[in-house]
Amino acid sequence: MIKVTLRSLADKWPSDIVARTEVKAFTGGTVSEKYMANLDSQGAGPNGRFKIGRKVAYPINELVEWLERRTVSLDE
């Protein structure tokens, strides 16, 4: 099994947090804001989410680790 590393996403992001509304941009369009909201409501989203005003955000390291756990290589 090939391990997929997404750490480069965090290295290129200009902040230590990612707003839920920016997850689509952060993941290159592979994960949408609505999908994240649905997973969060089921308790299946990344750990450590928090709110700033009306916006939900994720610590970047938690988001990357969560994405890596959910990622499967198709080149096996």
Language-model-derived ranges and their functions:
Residues I2-N38, E68-R69:
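Polyanion-binding surface elements
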Residues E22, E62-L63:
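Short, well-ordered alpha-helical scaffold segment located
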Residues E65-E76:
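DNA/chromatin major-groove-contacting recognition/catalytic segments
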Residues K3, F26-I60, S73-D75:
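Major-groove DNA-recognition helix of helix-turn-helix-type DNA-binding domains
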